[in-house]
Amino acid sequence: MDPCKFRPSSSFDTKTTTTNAGAPVWNDNEALTVGPRGPILLEDYHLIEKVAHFARERIPERVVHARGASAKGFFECTHDVTDITCADFLRSPGAQTPVIVRFSTVIHERGSPETIRDPRGFAVKFYTREGNWDLLGNNFPVFFIRDGIKFPDVIHAFKPNPRSHVQEYWRVFDFLSHHPESLHTFFFLFDDVGIPTDYRHMDGFGVNTYTFVTRDAKARYVKFHWKPTCGVSCLMDDEATLVGGKNHSHATQDLYDSIAAGNFPEWKLFVQVIDPEEEERFDFDPLDDTKTWPEDEVPLRPVGRLVLNRNVDNFFNENEQLAFGPGLVVPGIYYSDDKMLQCRVFAYADTQRYRLGPNYLMLPVNAPKCAHHNNHYDGAMNFMHRDEEVDYYPSRHAPLRHAPPTPITPRPVVGRRQKATIHKQNDFKQPGERYRSWAPDRQERFIRRFAGELAHPKVSPELRAIWVNYLSQCDESLGVKIANRLNVKPSM
């Protein structure tokens, strides 16, 4: 396949206006009418084409992460990690891989303010020599739920009320009162890190647990961490109101202007590594995306650096049509049995097929830079030039053959088919430890934000009591302080 065989490009622009089919247009100022004041004629093909195309310029926005901005650059491996993965782009220090990165807010629509208290997306597409690898994460290391079957529900709860189209936290607290594992993410959302100053000054995390595989099929669980070299910076509530009131696209503009000025954002990539044979020594499940791995027990290991040194050439082509999916992995990197990750592998690719069409991976920004070949043919908006006679496998008339075997962990999976939750939940320990690590003024800001949302008149007394009980199990003094603000009696 050769995606560059023929590609319409602005580099072929003519000096005069034409129709989409290339015919010259001699007047793009007036419609064709009967006389200077007469009715417009339907035979004015250029007018019809121009208006019809304008009416179809917008495509469905992402159901989540609709508001975002992209930039291009490279990833450089800086440390030898061949003892834990056979991924080619991590083959040796100094190896560089082109990337495109998209930062985003999560819940609100395209064009919404970038100062809203909301998780931020941090998605990286690596154009490796063995295909594209997409690492999708957030600026928080944990998520609200641990099972993908509840993903539509948690997004519905955070999205605006379907009656009023206003985001209301009573809906969030109602739904997540059934999911105490969500507490840990609330201790990031309502913390000072809940509103990053901009995209350049925020951490990134893979959130889910992935698997590194070596050439001899040795598997290890990994979590990914992006650390900005310029440090982490966040907006306080009053600052966010001021910044958002002046410019609702402040983070997008900051990213674009910084790169244009030669102030290239940079992040260091680290991994935490756990041998699956040792996972039972932890008091939590390493495949639970509502948990972090303690760095004193599982230290960060440096891998490489990410540098963004080019702005996108066209926002629509390289941001709106940019499509990520955790199902895109390369040899040496694989999924784990993390229930959220398993669901995301299907969901992200499916939403791209709906949003962009079945051939979304043919779009230049999504297509691999390496040579590739399969028998996926035709479909809506297929623009791949192909001249093969054989579109099946195997065939004695075509040279297509299987690639060399990719190392896959031989670990057996044994169990009964069942719908069940994980055994080691331990939902209150880590949020409590995080709260107690803060200075008193930071604790007070968290209490004010959390209690302020719980004070919504549609949050029932029963619901407030449930959340006070949860918070008390994280930290008894925290529960008492929240209860006093809400006039709720804490219970343990």
Curated annotation (Swiss-Prot):
SUPFAM superfamilies: Heme-dependent catalase-like. The gene is CATA. The keyword Oxidoreductase applies. It holds the Pfam family Catalase. Residues 8-21 have a biased composition (Polar residues). The modification Phosphotyrosine is found at Y210. GO terms for cellular component: cytoplasm; peroxisome; plasma membrane. It comes from Oryza sativa subsp. japonica. The active site is at H65, N138. Induction: Abundance in leaves follows a photoperiod-dependent circadian rhythm with an oscillating expression pattern peaking late in the light period. Inhibited by water stress. Repressed by abscisic acid (ABA), drought, high salinity (NaCl) and hydrogen peroxide (H(2)O(2)) treatments. Triggered by zinc oxide nanoparticles (ZnO NPs); this induction is reversed by sodium nitroprusside (SNP, a NO donor). Accumulates upon infection by the bacterial blight agent X.oryzae pv. Oryzae (Xoo) strain PXO99. One of its GO terms (molecular function) is heme binding. Homotetramer. Interacts with STRK1 at the plasma membrane. Optimum temperature is 30 degrees Celsius. It catalyses: 2 H2O2 = O2 + 2 H2O. Optimum pH is 8. Belongs to the catalase family. Keywords: Cell membrane, Cytoplasm, Heme, Hydrogen peroxide, Iron, Membrane, Metal-binding, Oxidoreductase, Peroxidase, Phosphoprotein, Stress response. Occurs in almost all aerobically respiring organisms and serves to protect cells from the toxic effects of hydrogen peroxide. Involved in environmental stress response. Promotes drought stress tolerance and recovery. This is Catalase isozyme A. Heme binds at R62, R102, F151, R344, Y348, R355. GO terms for biological process: circadian rhythm; hydrogen peroxide catabolic process; response to abscisic acid; response to bacterium; response to heat; response to hydrogen peroxide; response to light stimulus; response to salt. Residues 1-23 are annotated as: Disordered. It comes from the Eukaryota. InterPro entries: Catalase (IPR018028), Catalase_AS (IPR024708), Catalase_clade1/3 (IPR024711), Catalase_core (IPR011614), Catalase_haem_BS (IPR002226), Catalase_immune_responsive (IPR010582), Catalase_sf (IPR020835).
